[in-house]
């Protein structure tokens, strides 16, 4: 770690205090499957930067369990039919691919990421068939008789039985990310007649984002990021965004080590942290009442800025548009305001002050403060 005297001082970045999550109206599955996230304000350009990175991490980086193989009594290969079962094995495989299982491989659980075999015995007698109208559906929930996996869609039909029988079914479940075709899946101790499946591990179905303009104080040149995430239920949208953020942080940490110099960001000034009366007393001060160079004072006077209130409500880019107003004057003014615990581009809306009425409001507040002093005197 470098000496703090070599740290670089950067101007503050506007950041959201928190990310707001809300349900999407009309979405199937509710907030457990579809949610909207809003982050604002962000510096111009950061909305697309964060939105694109999060979208990619959500689509390719998240992990979830999936069935990677199965075996069943009487099934020798994928291209056959089983007597007493309506679906052929090819259709059973397709149904298994649509099975959604939920579980997190915990760090303190030995072998938590290893593939697991889930075994089930399906016994169907004549009374079961009669109660079901002659065709008994076997669902994903029926096959999860052991293990700690939870079925997201337990009513999902795997196959349909038409005569009394007893079947032994084995499902092998593994964790992964993205999509893996069957030829890329390597199984340890693969059993005879064990059929390997294509596996869709990614729990994220769809990610959309867009960026809107938003304001900070009187400055509208900021971004609002709106991110909409849809999952299949194996991971909730809120969890998905949190996991994607951690994945990105892990990768960015590699680049963070490239230079010993560290950036220290200036703190944003919050009006809430200061006593309102103290701030008002500063805002009504005339420009000529603070120690500025003649050049800076003249620049502000030429721009018809008479009070500190008129100055601090002004966004930095707008100040630079005034005639003869350069970087040197800007730096001097920012340093002086920092000494006063003020800054450019402040939001004074809680005082009823905006760019359109700041001059009149400062006069009104100045008169109010003078009247208050005279009354106390």
From Swiss-Prot:
Function noted in UniProt: DNA-dependent RNA polymerase catalyzes the transcription of DNA into RNA using the four ribonucleoside triphosphates as substrates.
Highest taxon of source: Bacteria
Any one GO cellular component localisation term in the record: DNA-directed RNA polymerase complex
Protein family per UniProt: Belongs to the RNA polymerase alpha chain family.
GO BP term (any one): DNA-templated transcription
Bridged cysteine pairs (disulfide): none
Gene that this sequence comes from: rpoA
UniProt subunit comment: Homodimer. The RNAP catalytic core consists of 2 alpha, 1 beta, 1 beta' and 1 omega subunit. When a sigma factor is associated with the core the holoenzyme is formed, which can initiate transcription.
Domain topic, free-text comment: The N-terminal domain is essential for RNAP assembly and basal transcription, whereas the C-terminal domain is involved in interaction with transcriptional regulators and with upstream promoter elements.
Record region (Alpha C-terminal domain (alpha-CTD)): 276-377
Xref: InterPro entries: DNA-dir_RNA_pol_insert, DNA-dir_RNA_pol_RpoA/D/Rpb3, DNA-dir_RpoA, RBP11-like, RNAP_asu_C, RNApol_insert_sf
GO MF annotation terms: DNA binding; DNA-directed RNA polymerase activity; protein dimerization activity
Record protein name field: DNA-directed RNA polymerase subunit alpha
Record carries keyword Transferase: yes
SMART domains: RPOLD
Region Alpha N-terminal domain (alpha-NTD): start-end pairs: 1-259
Pfam families in the record: RNA_pol_A_bac (PF01000), RNA_pol_A_CTD (PF03118), RNA_pol_L (PF01193)
Keywords, ordered alphabetically: DNA-directed RNA polymerase, Nucleotidyltransferase, Transcription, Transferase
Catalytic reactions of this protein: RNA(n) + a ribonucleoside 5'-triphosphate = RNA(n+1) + diphosphate
EC number: 2.7.7.6
HAMAP family documented for this protein: RNApol_bact_RpoA (MF_00059)
């Amino acid at each position: 770690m470098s000496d703090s005297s070599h740290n670089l001082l950067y101007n503050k970045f506007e950041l959201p205090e928190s990310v707001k999550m809300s349900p999407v109206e009309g979405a199937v599955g509710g907030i457990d499957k579809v949610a909207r996230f809003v982050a604002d304000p962000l510096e111009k350009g950061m909305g697309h930067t964060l939105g694109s990175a999060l979208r990619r991490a959500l689509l390719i980086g998240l992990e979830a369990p999936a069935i990677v193989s199965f075996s069943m009594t009487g099934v020798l290969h994928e291209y056959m039919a089983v007597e007493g079962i309506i679906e052929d094995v090819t259709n059973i495989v397709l149904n298994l691919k649509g099975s959604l299982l939920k579980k997190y491989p915990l760090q303190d659980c030995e072998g938590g990421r290893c593939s697991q075999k889930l075994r089930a015995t399906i016994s169907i007698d004549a009374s079961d068939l009669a109660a079901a109208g002659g065709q008994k559906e076997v669902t994903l929930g029926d096959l999860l008789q052991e293990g700690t996996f939870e079925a997201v869609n337990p009513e999902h039909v795997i196959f349909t039985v038409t005569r009394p029988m007893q079947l032994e079914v084995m499902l092998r479940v593994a964790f992964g990310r993205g999509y893996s075709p069957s030829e890329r899946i390597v199984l340890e101790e693969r059993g005879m007649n064990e059929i390997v499946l294509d596996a869709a591990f990614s729990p994220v179905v769809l990610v959309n984002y867009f960026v809107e303009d938003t304001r900070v104080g009187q400055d509208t040149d900021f971004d609002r990021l709106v991110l909409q995430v849809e999952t299949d239920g194996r991971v909730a949208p809120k969890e998905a965004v949190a996991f994607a953020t951690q994945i990105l942080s892990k990768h960015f940490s590699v680049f963070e080590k490239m230079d010993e110099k560290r950036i220290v960001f200036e703190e944003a000034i919050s009006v809430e942290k200061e006593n309102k009366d103290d701030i008002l007393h500063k805002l009504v001060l005339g420009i000529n009442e603070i120690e500025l160079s003649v050049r800076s004072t003249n620049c502000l006077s030429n721009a018809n800025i008479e009070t500190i209130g008129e100055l601090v409500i002004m966004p930095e880019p707008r100040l630079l548009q005034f005639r003869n107003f350069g970087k040197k004057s800007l730096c001097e003014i920012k340093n002086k305001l920092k000494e006063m615990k003020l800054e450019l581009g402040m939001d004074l809306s809680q005082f009823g002050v905006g760019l359109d009425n700041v001059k009149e409001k400062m006069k009104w507040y100045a008169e109010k403060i003078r009247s208050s002093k005279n009354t106390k005197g």
